A protein has these predicted regions:
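Acidic, polar-rich low-complexity tracts and alpha-helical solenoid repeat scaffolds
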Residues: 1-365
Length: 365
């Protein structure tokens, strides 16, 4: 389940946020830009307006329109190096969002070829970040790490550096370089990161370092996070990590208890809830050999996870196989019960049948 865990537990933060902004505000901005473009007195700034229109569409989720605006800028304003490079970056990002990877790669080849000629460090860092995003999409983690380090080194934007450092830590973790991952998570923890990123950096660092930190064991470190009111909305993730540590120690009953706590504490994080159900399903299937309970948890996992999740089809197939297994199990149990009844003496057999058909009613006092 490595692919699913990568998405649910340690979901990589996109190098460029695609979170939709206020829709009405974006529409108003686009109208302002359209008016601006049609006013010939501002002709020297039209390329800037096209860039802003492209970005407005991108952040509003209109990736096709965004790509068209950036493409127009690329074709018509090559003399403005800053806007030309910006348009290349953002067109590639738009195409990646549209899953048009081959076309995005062509843009990135152009971008890569002109990087050595660039002088502006801001432009260079953004280009490195775009190239890194493509390599992340293609699971080329080693190349992505190199490019991200270059992006961080050349950037002067503090929030970009923090964001990219967090992603770098995730990539180091994914490539099993836990020492570097811990170091980078610690950098994020000490920075002015947004709270959610800060919290996840702390959580991931604790998960990787194990029983350290002034003699406290991992469970104690994680439980300490629950005492801080700032972490109230993240209790599901904390309980999940506590359960994970118990599972590693083969304390499966305690693991089940905390996985269940994770599911009950989940508010809006359906990905986390899905992974907790998946863990419960796997434990019941592999360790407890309780296939009926495992089937129920697999059903819950499938209900929560979106169909485009990694390995969704694999989990669905396992669920269907378990359905067949549980059907056969129930049939065998029925046959065993019938054969047991058939072996009874006739007077006991009829009494047994009557007790099953008409359960004894306990008399009220």
């Amino acid at each position: 389940m490595a692919g699913l865990e990568s998405q649910l537990v340690n979901r990589a933060v996109p190098l460029v946020s695609t979170r939709p902004t206020d829709a009405q505000r974006c529409r108003n901005k686009r109208r302002d830009f359209d008016t601006f473009i049609n006013d010939k007195s501002f002709s020297n700034y039209i390329d800037d307006a096209y860039i802003l229109l492209g970005k407005a569409n991108f952040f509003n989720g209109n990736f096709f329109n965004a790509a068209e605006y950036f493409d127009y800028t690329i074709k018509n304003y090559k003399d403005n190096q800053s806007n030309y490079l910006t348009a290349l970056n953002w067109k590639a990002r738009s195409l990646m969002q549209l899953k048009r990877i081959a076309e995005a790669n062509e843009i990135l080849d152009t971008l890569d070829s002109i990087l050595p000629k660039l002088k502006g460090k801001k432009l260079v860092s953004e280009s490195f970040a775009t190239l890194a995003q493509m390599n992340i999409n293609l699971n080329n983690d080693t190349a992505a790490i190199t490019l991200l380090k270059d992006a961080i080194k050349t950037s002067k934007q503090i929030q970009n550096k923090i964001r990219w450092t967090y992603i770098l830590a995730q990539l180091y973790e994914r490539t099993q370089n836990h020492q570097e991952a811990i170091r980078r998570y610690k950098e994020v923890q000490k920075s002015n990161a947004p709270f959610e990123m800060y919290f996840n950096a702390v959580l991931n660092r604790i998960r990787l370092i194990g029983p350290q930190n002034a003699g406290k064991n991992k469970q104690e470190q994680l439980l300490a996070l629950l005492k801080d009111n700032k972490n109230f909305n993240y209790r599901d993730q904390v309980y999940f990590q506590i359960a994970e540590s118990f599972a590693v120690d083969k304390e499966y009953d305690k693991a089940v208890e905390n996985y269940n706590l994770s599911t009950t504490q989940t508010r809006d994080n359906q990905h986390q809830k899905g992974l907790s159900y998946l863990r419960l399903a796997e434990l019941n299937f592999k360790h407890f050999r309780d296939y009926l309970t495992a089937k129920e948890y697999y059903d819950s996992t499938i209900t929560i996870l979106p169909k485009n999740s990694p390995e969704y089809n694999l989990i669905l197939k396992k669920t269907l196989n378990l359905q067949y297994l549980t059907d056969r199990y129930e049939l065998i149990a029925l046959q065993d019960s019938l054969q047991e009844i058939a072996r009874l003496p006739e007077e006991l057999r009829m009494a047994k049948i009557n007790s099953l058909i008409n359960p004894v009613q306990i008399a009220k006092p």
